[in-house]
């Protein structure tokens, strides 16, 4: 989830996504007419999308069974999104769930030149990783990045060090990292 947020920051800094305040449906057409249609990237990355009536039955619950269903190929990300059609948002409280990360990843995949694969490759190159990394996609080609990024321990460390370096820099991505929660 943290790496998706980082790559989102790069997409914003590169101009592929205009701002954290943009609606997800402006980037992922399948979000139109769903519970998430008017959710901003800020809402999604901070897990405050107003989806407690869909993603869990209780605010703050992590019981949403999305991940298991998608990994076992019982449903695709797109099918889960469609199930939220015609639902209304609830109060925007923190509600941890994996689905929101994958929705943000889909937007980056659609709008970044070269897609999410290129965005992650750029991140890996900048960090100086040395081994192959990969992530899983569902049957429709939607990325599953809520927890399915694979890399060596050393490369994960290099990615973390790069995030730390960027945090401490006076750059667009540094400002994004320092201000994502308060933006």
Over which residues does each language-model region extend?
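Short beta-strand->loop
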Residues: 90-95, 105-108
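Conserved active-site loop region of the serine DD-peptidase/beta-lactamase
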Residues: 113-131, 149, 153-183
């Amino acid at each position: 989830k943290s790496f998706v947020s980082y790559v989102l920051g790069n997409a914003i800094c590169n101009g592929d996504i205009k701002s954290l305040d943009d609606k997800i449906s402006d980037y992922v057409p399948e979000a139109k007419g769903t519970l998430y249609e008017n959710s901003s990237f800020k809402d999604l990355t901070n897990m405050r999308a107003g989806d407690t009536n869909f993603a869990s039955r209780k605010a703050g619950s992590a019981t949403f069974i999305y991940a298991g269903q998608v990994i076992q190929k019982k449903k695709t990300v797109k099918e889960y999104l469609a199930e939220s059609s015609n639902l209304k948002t609830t109060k925007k409280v923190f509600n941890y769930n994996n689905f929101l990360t994958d929705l943000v990843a889909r937007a980056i995949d659609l709008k970044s030149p070269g897609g999410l694969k290129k965005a992650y490759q750029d991140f890996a190159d900048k960090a100086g990783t040395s081994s192959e990394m990969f992530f899983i996609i569902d049957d429709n080609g939607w990325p599953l990045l809520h927890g399915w990024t694979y890399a060596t321990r050393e490369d994960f460390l290099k990615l973390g060090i790069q995030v730390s370096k960027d945090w401490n820099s006076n750059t667009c991505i540094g400002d994004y990292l320092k201000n994502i929660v308060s933006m």
